[in-house]
Amino acid sequence: MELEAMSRYTSPVNPAVFPHLTVVLLAIGMFFTAWFFVYEVTSTKYTRDICKELLISLVASLFMGFGVLFLLLWVGIYV
């Protein structure tokens, strides 16, 4: 297969929106992280719910992970 015959790869996400995605995703992730910490500090061992803890931490880690991914893409570290 010839190199000229191949089509150039284009990103599914426009690089112009990397800064906006970074800020929004990291802000949402930090909100859920703060909520998780406040929940852990203010609840007693009798009122804690493992499902709620896991759900909040999963959502926080997903948003923070994708936020860091777009931060790396924004600064030019293409992963």
Swiss-Prot record:
Subunit of the oligosaccharyl transferase (OST) complex that catalyzes the initial transfer of a defined glycan (Glc(3)Man(9)GlcNAc(2) in eukaryotes) from the lipid carrier dolichol-pyrophosphate to an asparagine residue within an Asn-X-Ser/Thr consensus motif in nascent polypeptide chains, the first step in protein N-glycosylation. N-glycosylation occurs cotranslationally and the complex associates with the Sec61 complex at the channel-forming translocon complex that mediates protein translocation across the endoplasmic reticulum (ER). All subunits are required for a maximal enzyme activity. Component of the oligosaccharyltransferase (OST) complex. OST exists in two different complex forms which contain common core subunits RPN1, RPN2, OST48, OST4, DAD1 and TMEM258, either STT3A or STT3B as catalytic subunits, and form-specific accessory subunits. STT3A complex assembly occurs through the formation of 3 subcomplexes. Subcomplex 1 contains RPN1 and TMEM258, subcomplex 2 contains the STT3A-specific subunits STT3A, DC2/OSTC, and KCP2 as well as the core subunit OST4, and subcomplex 3 contains RPN2, DAD1, and OST48. GO terms for molecular function: oligosaccharyltransferase complex binding. It comes from Canis lupus familiaris (Dog). Residues 1-16, 76-79 are lumenal. Keywords: Acetylation, Cytoplasm, Endoplasmic reticulum, Membrane, Transmembrane, Transmembrane helix. The keyword Acetylation applies. The chain crosses the membrane at residues 17-37, 55-75. One of its GO terms (cellular component) is cytoplasm. PANTHER family: TRANSMEMBRANE PROTEIN 258 (PTHR13636). This is Dolichyl-diphosphooligosaccharide--protein glycosyltransferase subunit TMEM258. It holds the Pfam family Ost5. One of its GO terms (biological process) is protein glycosylation. It is a multi-pass membrane protein. The keyword Transmembrane applies. InterPro entries: TMEM258/Ost5. Belongs to the OST5 family. It is found in: Membrane; Endoplasmic reticulum; Cytoplasm.
